[in-house]
A protein has these predicted regions:
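RNase H-like, metal-dependent nuclease domains and their acidic two-metal-ion catalytic environment used
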Residues: 1-87, 109-163
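Alpha-helical elements of the RecA-like P-loop NTPase motor core of helicases
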Residues: 69-73, 98, 178
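Conserved beta-strand -> loop -> alpha-helix junction used to position metal-binding or nucleic-acid-contacting
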Residues: 81-103
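Residue-level signal for mature regions of secreted extracellular proteins and peptides
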Residues: 159, 170-173
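Short cysteine-rich clusters marking metal-coordination/redox-active sites
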Residues: 163-166, 177-180
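Short Cys/His-rich "knuckle" micro-motifs
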Residues: 172-176, 187
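Short Cys/His-rich micro-motifs in 6-15 aa windows
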Residues: 181-187
Length: 187
């Protein structure tokens, strides 16, 4: 789970990008969820921890350039046991995104479902734009962490509930698809 945090919550605030991704043992990357939102820091921290538990993630990655130590403190207030790694951007967005763009070009990144707002940011963002591509930033951090070997592999087959309606894999404990709402016993 990766977070690109917004530290304010008003009409002009950016969203907090929160994206869940995984890597299979075959070297394929899966974008599993985008739970980005415009909310107060305590609310987005709860949302990130919720995604962490739902997807049984190894850790939460948070870009600290804007939020500093605040991200880790907020996450630990929600769940003291959450695994968190702070990352700091030392290069521009475009340079950070290039290796991830290469993974897409190689056909190694797959979106499980449709993430309209994330995909729109990915298609429309240019380096000269003033508005932050919060969802895309979170995606880049998630895939960068996975491609660097920083997190363990996932086995999508172990996520036994596969929605027949939208194709979203879900944890074994889920009774409904949280992407489209289909109940698994109705499939």
């Amino acid at each position: 789970v990766a977070i690109d945090p917004a530290v304010t919550n008003n009409e002009t605030s950016d969203e907090t990008g929160i994206v869940v991704a995984g890597l299979t043992t075959e070297g394929q990357y899966y974008v599993l969820d985008d739970v980005s939102l415009k909310a107060s820091p305590d609310t987005w921290a709860k949302k990130a921890v919720e995604a962490y538990h739902l997807w049984k993630a190894d850790r939460i990655i948070g870009e600290a350039n804007n939020g500093g130590d605040m991200i880790g403190l907020l996450l630990k207030q929600v769940d003291i046991n959450v695994s968190y790694t702070k990352v700091t951007a030392s290069r521009g967005k475009q340079v950070r995104a290039e290796p991830i763009s290469a993974l897409y070009e190689q056909g190694r990144v797959h979106h499980v479902g449709v993430f309209e707002k994330l995909e729109t940011q990915m298609c429309e963002w240019t380096p000269d734009m003033a508005k932050s591509p919060d969802r895309m930033d979170a995606l880049v951090w998630a895939l960068t962490e996975l491609s660097s070997g920083g997190s363990s592999m996932i086995a999508l087959a172990s996520m036994s509930n596969m929605c027949q309606s939208c194709g979203m894999p879900s944890p074994k404990t889920a009774t409904i698809c949280f992407k489209c709402g289909t109940q698994f016993n109705e499939q």
